[in-house]
Design a protein with these regions (language model features):
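Carbohydrate transferase catalytic cores enriched for Leloir-type hexosyltransferases
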Residues: 1-352
Length: 352
């Protein structure tokens, strides 16, 4: 997914700046666009006719053995289940949407994640959770896992701490894929409520068309605010940054997230964030976020109404900007990479 791509590429960039001693091999069944920069980082293409998950389970272990890998890292919820002598396994666990909100996922994805993801968790030597929230979810669903196996290592962001505040335009922004879990129908209904109250909300949606997006598009087609909503599709990094910076506010009504990177991207752009009160968003933003119940269009409409009644809410106060700095300094890819490297090295070390 696009979120995993951002996670993996940024973490690889940061690891390459940090570590010139250990040797890394990146295995892929097909060519990738990402370019490695260091001599100690190697891309190994292993052409395969198998679907990704079957390549991972049945072909990848042979390469891991041939290349004499000490520590194998699975960055996306699953890992090969075969036990290889001398190989330690590290797994990143992003979220448990497949258990909490199964109906918001394709059945095939849900089945694969449930079958292989659960077994991957049980067969890993170290588990990296992207937030405290995900670590709590892991302990809830897998209560038998030893606490010392679980490491909370937050995602990062390439921050622009000194960024100037840009002039705000009269639109709300949502970024992410158009799929049921992102809860865009509730956002649509909230904006309809605001229109009934005499406000003129405009919304821009940036992101790829996800699974089951037709139902949202049908709701939009029949909506009283359809002419005020723009679906922009997948955008370049530069265009997305410009949208983040010029939006009146960023709205993120997602039902469930393991981390919630878009809220951090909006904060980085000095844009006010309205977000679901669930999952880890409060963990990231603290008092800087404006929260609502994602299950209720009335709660969301009431939150957004504050913005239309008080336009200065689009801008952070000096005190809030100080807090923003602290948050962005905490969530850096450099910190993420340092802590990941520490997990890799402790797994590679022989137990005394």
């Amino acid at each position: 997914s696009s979120g995993i791509k951002v996670y993996l590429e940024n973490l690889l960039d940061a690891l390459q700046k940090l570590d010139s001693e250990n040797t890394y091999f990146l295995f892929s069944p097909s060519p990738i666009s990402y370019k490695l920069k260091n001599e100690n980082f190697n891309l190994v293409i292993t052409p395969s006719k198998l679907p990704g998950i079957l390549w991972q389970q049945y072909e990848l272990p042979h390469y891991v053995k041939d290349y004499k890998i000490d520590v194998f890292w699975g960055p996306e919820q699953t890992i090969f289940l075969k036990k290889l002598s001398g190989v330690k396994k590290v797994l990143t666990v992003h979220d448990f949407a497949y258990r909490r909100y199964p109906k918001t996922m394709k059945r095939s994805v849900r089945t694969i994640t449930e079958h292989y993801g659960s077994r991957s968790i049980l067969r890993s030597d170290a588990l990296v959770c992207v937030s405290d929230f995900t670590a709590k979810e892991l302990s809830h669903f897998f209560s038998g896992i030893a606490k010392d196996k679980i490491h909370v290592i937050d995602n990062g962001i390439i921050s622009s701490i000194e960024k100037e505040t840009e002039s705000k335009e009269d639109f709300l922004l949502f970024t992410g894929s158009l799929e049921p879990r992102k809860n865009l129908k509730t956002l649509l209904r909230a904006l309809e409520i605001l229109k009934e109250k005499g406000f003129s909300p405009r919304l821009k949606i940036a992101g790829p068309a996800g699974w089951k997006n037709k139902s949202f598009r049908a709701a939009l087609e029949n909506s009283s605010i359809r002419d005020s909503v723009e679906i922009l599709g997948f955008l370049s990094k530069e265009k997305l940054e410009h949208l983040y910076a010029t939006a009146k506010a960023f709205v993120f009504p997602s039902l469930y997230e393991g981390f919630g990177l878009p809220v951090l991207e909006a904060l980085n752009a000095k844009t006010r964030v309205f977000t679901s009160e669930n999952s880890p968003m409060q963990e990231i933003l603290g008092k800087l976020g404006i929260y609502f119940s994602p299950e209720s269009e009335i709660s969301l409409a009431n939150s957004l109404e504050k913005l239309y009644l008080n336009s200065t809410l689009s801008f952070y106060t000096e005190k809030e900007l100080e807090k923003r700095r602290e948050i962005l300094e905490k969530y850096s890819w450099e910190n993420t990479a340092k802590r990941m490297l520490s997990v890799f090295e402790s797994c590679a070390r022989p137990k005394s």
